[in-house]
Amino acid sequence: MAAKIIDGKTIAQQVRSEVAQKVQARVAAGLRAPGLAVVLVGSNPASQIYVASKRKACDEVGFVSHSYDLPETTSEAELLALIDTLNADNTIDGILVQLPLPAGIDNVKVLERIAPDKDVDGFHPYNVGRLCQRAPRLRPCTPRGIVTLLERYNIDTYGLNAVVIGASNIVGRPMSMELLLAGCTTTVTHRFTKDLRHHVEHADLLIVAVGKPGFIPGEWIKEGAIVIDVGINRLENGKVVGDVVFDEAAARASYITPVPGGVGPMTVATLIENTLQACIEYHDPQGK
């Protein structure tokens, strides 16, 4: 079978358009537009690209974007002080600190300093805990974006045998919680997993997030499986590929996400959704 392509670019644009309409309605009703503060420390080229795409998305949907570009020499205390200021600012609904941070700054301490109701990345232990307890508030962006893709393609996840490859805090672990909420029987594999092929071959829904090009051969994919490839890997020739061997997998799967243009755009779209949610539900409820 030839897999149907899950077009993340188109779905992400739909999500952003829906948010833009809600923002326009808020402003027309005399309410403020949501505000998102994006903090970049240092000059990591990849981080600069990610931050630029997030700021552009903000502007497109009518948010008020607050940019904080700090030098590489910024101390942890200075960064924490900025977060305290942003936490206290009633015009800011979301705070995003771009990772990775320079050496000498504790990522965990910084992420935990962000007020949970402004944690639009969904990384704060409070928000992760809420997701674990089946009462989510702000949800981690990439896992939530993947669930949105499945929903928009009317894929019924109840009862599916789901396998997540990779157990990172950003994707793998929260993804497993989202899949449990979506009614899947969920397995998470990691570097100590024995017989990875066996797990992949029995997956009705496979989500791969390891950051290694071509890590999963197409021949491992179960006939008719749904394949979600979170990997974004740039080869020496400049080509961007995922963690799954795409052409081989697409010949066996029923649905598959391409790289690029699959999961990536949904991460930013979900960040935008989370910021609107934070504004309406936690900071400016009269806008409901």
Curated annotation (Swiss-Prot):
GO terms for molecular function: methenyltetrahydrofolate cyclohydrolase activity; methylenetetrahydrofolate dehydrogenase (NADP+) activity. This is Bifunctional protein FolD. The gene is folD. Belongs to the tetrahydrofolate dehydrogenase/cyclohydrolase family. HAMAP family: THF_DHG_CYH (MF_01576). Pathway: One-carbon metabolism; tetrahydrofolate interconversion. Pfam families: THF_DHG_CYH (PF00763), THF_DHG_CYH_C (PF02882). It catalyses: (6R)-5,10-methylene-5,6,7,8-tetrahydrofolate + NADP(+) = (6R)-5,10-methenyltetrahydrofolate + NADPH; (6R)-5,10-methenyltetrahydrofolate + H2O = (6R)-10-formyltetrahydrofolate + H(+). NADP(+) binds at residues 166-168, 232. The keyword S-adenosyl-L-methionine does not apply. GO terms for cellular component: cytosol. It comes from the Bacteria. Its EC number is 1.5.1.5, 3.5.4.9. Keywords: Amino-acid biosynthesis, Histidine biosynthesis, Hydrolase, Methionine biosynthesis, Multifunctional enzyme, NADP, One-carbon metabolism, Oxidoreductase, Purine biosynthesis. InterPro entries: Aminoacid_DH-like_N_sf, NAD(P)-bd_dom_sf, THF_DH/CycHdrlase, THF_DH/CycHdrlase_cat_dom, THF_DH/CycHdrlase_CS, THF_DH/CycHdrlase_NAD-bd_dom. Homodimer. Catalyzes the oxidation of 5,10-methylenetetrahydrofolate to 5,10-methenyltetrahydrofolate and then the hydrolysis of 5,10-methenyltetrahydrofolate to 10-formyltetrahydrofolate. One of its GO terms (biological process) is methionine biosynthetic process.
